[in-house]
Amino acid sequence: MKTLQFREAICEAMSEEMRRDESIYLMGEEVAEYNGAYKASKGMLDEFGEKRVIDTPIAELGFAGIAVGSTMTGNRPIVEFMTFNFSLVGIDQIINNAAKIRQMSGGQFKCPVVFRGPTASAGQLAATHSQAFESWFANCPGLKVIVPSNPYDAKGLLKAAIRDDDPVIFMESEQMYGDKGEVPEGEYILPIGVADIKRAGSDVTVVSFGKIIKEAYKAADVLDKEGISCEIIDLRTVRPLDINTVLQSVKKTNRLVILEAVSYTHLTLPTTRGG
């Protein structure tokens, strides 16, 4: 095992896949000369050249469309959005083309494209850089949505996403790029649509994904001191959702808590849902 930052795991996954398959290329704002806004493509321009690591104009609709169109000629593009907030500029290409090409062509065309970048809140980047979009894309038929919580999952799931023949939304966090974790030395791929039990427990099931998994660990540590055993499930993939893993855990614990990123500091009491 070796220790990598989250951004390094992302870079390693893309680089390994691009060495394996020449039809894969990376495009987006500042991905080449600047090594990516969050340095997730560091060194890739030097290794693969400007034909496969492509700096784009600030025109998300345009380069999202180029990526989707290029899948129809046998390419497998990776598109980096500087933030998924900017994906809204190109959302017509994602929703009305990428997600529907296979069906609209009667199966004649696949659309193996990965749209990746940070989502949700970040450090002092204001409202237009801070919205979470996983639920938006997860409600669109034809898309797969992955939100990893650590470097190990990020690398294994990104490699799977790149090899997938359908469009994948791969969401990261600006607050996690420096997080470190152990990653195997050799190649590995994690299956899309399979949740992971990060911590076994017996009293309550805690379900979350992405950066909020770290908060789940903190809560579980506090509850453990009170004699309450938490089972933490990391969804990893929001669509397709691994509901079976969650149900099996709830059958054991009979209690379920779902953690999401909301404005807890402005609430008199925590959010609850009865029934």
Predicted features by range, described:
Residues E231-S249:
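Generic long, charged, amphipathic alpha-helical segments
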Residues A9-A13, K155-P167, G178-V222, E226, ...:
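Glycine-/acidic-rich phosphate or pyrophosphate-binding loops and their flanking alpha/beta elements
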Residues T253-S263:
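Glycine-rich phosphate-binding loop
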Residues M1-P167, M171:
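Thiamine diphosphate
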Residues M44-E50, E215-I233:
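Short helix-loop-beta junction
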Residues Y25, T205-V207, V257:
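Conserved beta-strand elements of the Class I
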Residues T265-T271:
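Conserved small/polar residues in nucleotide/adenosyl-binding loops
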